[in-house]
Amino acid sequence: MIVVTGAAGFIGSNLVRGLNRRGIYDIIAIDDLTEGDKFRNLVDCRIADYMHHEDARALLKAGQFPRVRAVLHQGACSDTTERNGQYMMDNNYRVTLEWFEYCQANRVPLIYASSAAVYGASTVYVEDPANEGPLNVYGYSKLLFDQVLRTRMDKLTAQVVGLRYFNVYGPHEQHKGRMASVAFHNMNQFLAEGHVRLFSGWDGYADGGQSRDFISVEDVVDVNLHFLDHPGTSGIFNCGTGRAQPFNDVAAAVVNTLRAEQGEAPLSLDELVSQGLIRYIPFPDDLKGRYQSFTQANVDALRAAGYTAVMRDVQTGVSEYVRYWRSRKSLA
């Protein structure tokens, strides 16, 4: 059995699909379906069992959780604006620690979701404590377990890998609401209003020129499975493309892919702007000084760990995403 926590969530459900594509169906999916809507993310997946996350946690604490082949731990509170520190630390730090202790006691590989939020305002995205300084309790909840792993690295009984996800986009994120990716919101905006809105220039960047390391969830799944295939490798690794691209690229990919559906030719950025298909709104005063205008993962450690696949750029990945959702007609 392989455990996937957060299995009905965005990255978790895509991981289940990735395992299914390999013919792996003996999966224990752990999540919280109290509100129910996320079940849709698992409808087309094959799993062996579903378990509520609190039931799984009770078994962990009692030392009664069955031994499994591996744990892919994606379950967490991913709302970076959550201000309840106790809730965040319990869900993100403490639960990860409990899975870690279980996996070490039973010699089970653990691959868990960390976050690029650990870097805070740093402009150097290398997996080194000198570059880390989270700006919110979400980032701290992720950093604290990374620090635990560092102190235990020379005593591990089984693989432990922390993946610092950058800006992930792709299918099955619709339940995330305002925390969904820029690509998702751009799609909804264009379909509803016929144009996409981006922030105007600030902090030395042109209109829509603020940049992020946008990574397709398909590449995130591939990275997870790479480490699952290499249980002798442990450590903390950035999970990004190593390529920063502006928000303009995301918006252009969304609009041009949707235009192509109607048989319309692609437009350049200047043409998209001049025709009012991309519009810029004033940069919010309350974000000035608190906004990351640029992120770009250093992927040297990831490459050194043997992951050599070419990752999708925004033009490829976002277009795939748009076509997928339109084919499913599930964008709302």
UniProtKB/Swiss-Prot annotation:
SUPFAM superfamilies: NAD(P)-binding Rossmann-fold domains. Keywords: Carbohydrate metabolism, Isomerase, NADP. GO terms for biological process: ADP-L-glycero-beta-D-manno-heptose biosynthetic process; carbohydrate metabolic process. Binds 1 NADP(+) per subunit. Substrate binds at residues 167, 178, 185, 199-202, 212, 291. NADP(+) binds at residues 10-11, 31-32, 38, 74-78, 91, 142, 168, 176. Disulfide bonds: none annotated. It comes from the Bacteria. Catalyzes the interconversion between ADP-D-glycero-beta-D-manno-heptose and ADP-L-glycero-beta-D-manno-heptose via an epimerization at carbon 6 of the heptose. This is ADP-L-glycero-D-manno-heptose-6-epimerase. It comes from Bordetella avium (strain 197N). The gene is hldD.
